[in-house]
Structure formats: C-alpha cells, structure tokens
Amino acid sequence: MSHAHGTRIQEHIGDPVSDAPPVSREKLEEIFQDIQADLRFDHELNGCLNCGICTATCPSAHYYDYSPREIVQLLWTENLEGIYDAMQEKIWACAQCYTCAARCPFGNSPGGLVMLMREVAIKHGMESARNVLRPFSRVMLKL
C-alpha cells in the first residue's frame, strides 16, 4: 500500500490469504476441459432445477461451507473462476456418501462431479490437493 496525500491506495488486489499469482484464463479453461473430458462427466451432470434437495440432504452441508447445488451450478454454467475457487477448499468437504445423487430429481451426481474435480486438482498439482494428501504420504511410503 502506498500513501498519497494521506489516503491509502491498495496497489495489488488479490487473495489476502495466499501469495499465489493469479491464474490465467488459459489455465482455468484447461482445468475445466480436463473435468469435462472425463467420460463420467456427461453421466453425472444432466441439468439442474436449482431445487436444493441435494444440499438439504447433504451431511457435509450441515457442518461445512459446502453445497452440492453450488458445485452443479458452477459446472452447468461453466463458471471457470468459481470452479477453480471451489477446487481450493470446498470439494474436499464432500463426504462422498452420494446422498445427493440418490435424491436429485434430474439424476445428477454432485458427489461424482466432486470426485472428478478432486482428480483434476491432483493432476494439476493444486496446493489444496497437496494439503489434503500430505498426511497420507508417510503411509504410502510404508506400503
């Protein structure tokens, strides 16, 4: 921040928690294309009425800042920035119980979509994936 005539001017606006550089549009598109290219994608995402049944029945939504409906909407609308943001933390809150899929009137599987997003996060070496998998690294070395 610099001071000009007694006022504070913020020179850089970014994530206050992370010093990571902003993600390019090309990288966001590549991540979404990797999710969309998976053969399971079209089976897991069939449309969305935005009814919220998936979120109302989701155990993780009761305890975390997580909404299966949000995941479906982000992917359905191809909101690249929102998808990337969700891959930083939200997708790791899903318990993979698939209650959302059992209850969805459209036959969507938000849990299945989250699994795809997790796999892509690992493939792209996202920090969120490394943080989640770090505790397992010692176990894997012992196998």
In which residue ranges do the predicted regions lie?
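Cysteine-centered iron-sulfur cluster-binding motifs in ferredoxin-type domains/subunits
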Residues: 44-61, 88-108
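Short secondary-structure boundary segments
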Residues: 2-13, 55-78
